Amino acid sequence: MSGTSYIIRRMTYDDIPQVAQIDKEAFPGEWVFRSQAAYKQDLDNPSIRYVVAYREQDARESGRQATPRPRWFKRLFSYERRLNTREYVVGFSGFWMMVGEAHIIAIGVREGYRQLGIGERLLIATIDLAQTLRANVVTLEVRASNMIAQELYKKYGFQVTGRRLKYYSSDGEDAIIMSTDSIASLVFQASFRQLKADHAQRHREIIGLVG
């Protein structure tokens, strides 16, 4: 995937088909609860936020240059239809806000793009957005068997706070409940800044949240 960069941005309506496809692939058995219609409803809900990571080929790979647009244009038309066919969504994350808590709905990455730091960057973007919305803590559920994800969450300050028995309808697996301490605390913010800097140093091809 040489010559390729990945950019994190807010999800738009035009991303829904690709995100639903990733959801189905990443969460078989659960994806029916987040259909394309459900994503449309989520994007209409002011308490829910989604971001996506998309793959962008450079001019050498694509053979053409993207038309540059001034910053004011991008702000004004932040939900414009994205006609740039080079934007191939490779991952997404979403959360909902409720009384000072940002609860992560899902973080999913296409099979061919895992272990590239994209999922971690989506988690970073999620925490960034939660801080912007003045959340106090971030929470989530994760499969009891998904140790890789649990280790990533622990790296970012999540701790095990409980267990939901037979939470996943597809196979009856338990869910581990994880939560951060206050993301507004100086201790968390210092650690988070360092983790973000380390990730940016290792993965220069992944550009943080824009727009």
Role assignments for model-derived ranges:
Residues Q41-L43, W96, S145, Y167-D171:
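A short beta-turn/loop motif at secondary-structure boundaries
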Residues R110, R114, R143-S145, S170:
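Residue-level recognition of the GNAT/N-acetyltransferase active site
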Residues S62, L116, A149, V187-F188:
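Intrinsically disordered, low-complexity acidic/polar segments
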Residues T139-E141, K154, Q159-I176, Q189, ...:
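Conserved catalytic-core motifs of GNAT/GCN5-like acyltransferases
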